[in-house]
């Protein structure tokens, strides 16, 4: 299996086991859900009437005042009272076996390859850290929305792209299913292709 680099027009041989893998929609969905759930902090929490400070003494007598009866100033009906159905901290993390995760990444990368959304370049380097120059480089390739995968992310490439919503840049060790699916194109360098093959083997 071969792919042509868009800059030098040279042929690059690809591993069929990685770039021509059968698409498994169920596994990809599971990997995406697991990744997104593991990113959740789960810190949302409120206090119930039993946890709010104060409220031990009955505010006024049960009878004789003409007011509605009240047993505590920390009732959920009161200002500064507890929350009726208070949410608590919870752990949203899920487990996905390494083999399953690798197969999900193979499925996504192979589908990108089949649909023509995987773009290979011989190298990707910016002369400086300016966003304007980074955009100019992407416009020359006629790519308006992309994830760029490099073997190692340089400082100029990182600084030039970090303020842009339509582009993201990462190295091979930090690729994830959500980023691979979020962008229209995935631009990969030749050096990164070799590392991806080693990592997903």
From Swiss-Prot:
Residues 42-67 are annotated as: Disordered. Keywords: Ribonucleoprotein, Ribosomal protein, RNA-binding, rRNA-binding. Gene3D superfamilies: 3.40.1370.10. The keyword Ribosomal protein applies. The keyword RNA-binding applies. Pfam families: Ribosomal_L4. One of its GO terms (molecular function) is structural constituent of ribosome. GO terms for biological process: translation. It comes from the Bacteria. Coiled coil: none annotated. GO terms for cellular component: ribonucleoprotein complex; ribosome. Part of the 50S ribosomal subunit. One of the primary rRNA binding proteins, this protein initially binds near the 5'-end of the 23S rRNA. It is important during the early stages of 50S assembly. It makes multiple contacts with different domains of the 23S rRNA in the assembled 50S subunit and ribosome. Forms part of the polypeptide exit tunnel. Belongs to the universal ribosomal protein uL4 family. NCBIfam families: rplD_bact (TIGR03953). This is Large ribosomal subunit protein uL4.
